[in-house]
Amino acid sequence: MTSDFIQMISDWRDSRYSQTMKNLVANKTPCGAFLNDVSKLQMFRNFFKASKFNLTCICVMKKEDKTFEPEEGEQIVALEEFHSVNPKPKFMFVLGGFFPLMFMDYFKPHGTKMFFNNGRSNAQDVYNLYMKHLPELYNVHEMLADEESKKAFRSYMNARVTNVLNDFRFAPEPQYFLEGFLPANGDIAIDGGAFDGATTIDFARQGAQVYGFEMNADNYKNCLARIDNNDSGGGCHVTIENLGLSNQEGEESYRPGAAGSRKDPNGTLTAKFIDLDTYATRKNLPRVDYIKLDIEGAELDMLHGAAKTITRYKPKMAISAYHRREDLWTLFNYVKSLRSDYEFKFRHYRIDCTDYLFNDKQREIFRKFGLSYFCPSNCEAVFYCK
């Protein structure tokens, strides 16, 4: 194994989340709690007391939220007062949702790292799974085409084990827009998981003929409206299908969730699905040059349903690889089994929340503290293939 990969595995002995928790207690390391919702105060305090952590700082959103008294050893500060805290907590704990994760960059200059809220058991499960599948993970790592991919891949694995948000390595370019892996002018592109049509329009502006697939009926309507209200550029043809992509044609249940709608046998709604091989034949597509997939854990199913298309045309692909823990190796291995001549890269992105996820009031708060609208998280990991 290469030295960097070996070093990462070796470091996990002390850096994995469960061991870090033990070290925090043993060393009485100063820790903080970021309470964007003060109603969770007692929950936080109970957690810290039960875990025997050294809680030295409770940080609330604004001065008006300082409505409770500090307990022994605690400092209560508003976010804008955090610079005055001494000693600074080494780690900040947060609870629930994406909103508190946005403040990673605010705490970072003060030397305070942030745990993202997946919990001890989740991180331990990831660690156990990764250790079980080290040969597969190492194989993927070694097959990545550039050093940046390897660094991003190791960082992604590492952060999932440490549960430290700062350990991720986020790419600078817009998601799906890695140079060399984009649809070109005249390409036939598949947008699997079109959501609101934004990526469909982006690909059309590259000059591609785009076929977008969205199983959620409400999202499908939003796609149509967005495309009607936008110049997709170059007079390029865009088709939006109210279909999900899968390994076969049929009807299945799904659980609605805006950007997170996913197939679920216990789901409350139903949608029609189709495999890409059947769709391409039925629509007489002369070829497929590009595929983007973000379909909430159904990526491997879809790839099985596109096996003939991928084998025949070797399209460039951008495949989301974070919905299932095993995506880091199963997606890679399957694509490699279809075409051994694929080149692979890996990137991890912040969530673009410019017009998504947060409301105007929350965005105003981000601006006040000099933060972007891009949310750091464990989501948005992408395998690129060409």
Question: Where are the regions that the model predicts?
Answer:
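Phosphate/nucleotide-binding beta-alpha loop and adjacent structural elements of enzyme active sites
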Residues: M1-C57, M61-K386
